[in-house]
């Protein structure tokens, strides 16, 4: 009486186990590198998001610079030094003047780079002094460059460009450059 054989032979099982072991070892060596690259990419994206958020914030204020719903005296935009400090004035409440008091409702705002940190001050009248608030976290981000450049073109409103270069403090090789231009229609 014939006996039907079913299943795998011992040799086939051993060969299958050897092949799967080689594949598993290859995957085990590849996985940490994949996780490291994923973490590096995530950190760079977080740094880019942070820097672009700051650049857009400054650019928004630059675009509003000089707006006045009445008769305002003074300059709507003051770029100090090499462009690493900027003071912007605009009539936020449309009352026709650039309010200086109270400071919490002042129509002036300043941005400056000091000791690799972007800082801001509501009611700023100069780039010196104390009381400036840190906009970036110095324990996480090192701002190498913050610069506002004004380009005057005859017959047109000036173009204002915000340039920022930053690095991650934990990974200094992770560097982000951001540059964004707006038109100063009120200047």
From Swiss-Prot:
Residue stretch(es) of the prosequence: 1-7
Keywords attached to this entry: Membrane, Methylation, Transmembrane, Transmembrane helix
Membrane topology designation: Single-pass membrane protein
Principal location listed in the UniProt entry: membrane
Example of a GO cellular component annotation carried by this entry: membrane
Transmembrane segments: 8-28
Residues carrying N-methylphenylalanine: 8
PROSITE patterns the record matches: PROKAR_NTER_METHYL (PS00409)
Cross-referenced Pfam families: N_methyl
A GO biological-process term: protein secretion by the type II secretion system
Function: Not yet known.
Protein name according to UniProt: Prepilin peptidase-dependent protein B
Organism the protein comes from: Escherichia coli (strain K12)
Gene assigned in the entry: ppdB
């Amino acid at each position: 009486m014939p006996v039907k054989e079913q299943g795998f032979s011992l040799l086939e099982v051993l060969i299958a186990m050897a092949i799967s072991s080689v594949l598993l070892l290859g995957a085990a060596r590849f996985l940490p590198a994949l996780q490291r690259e994923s973490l590096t990419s995530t950190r760079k994206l977080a740094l880019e998001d942070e820097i672009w958020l700051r650049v857009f914030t400054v650019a928004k204020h630059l675009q509003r610079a000089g707006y006045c719903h009445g008769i305002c005296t003074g300059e709507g935009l003051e770029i100090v030094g090499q462009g690493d400090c900027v003071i912007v004035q605009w009539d936020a409440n449309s009352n026709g003047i650039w309010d200086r008091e109270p400071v919490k409702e002042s129509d002036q705002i300043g941005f400056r780079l000091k000791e690799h940190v972007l800082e801001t001050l509501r009611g700023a009248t100069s780039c010196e002094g104390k009381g400036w608030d840190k906009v970036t976290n110095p324990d996480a981000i090192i701002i190498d460059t913050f610069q506002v450049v004004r380009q005057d073109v005859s017959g047109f409103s000036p173009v204002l460009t915000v340039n920022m270069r930053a690095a991650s403090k934990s990974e200094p090789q992770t560097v982000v450059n951001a540059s964004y231009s707006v038109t100063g229609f009120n200047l």
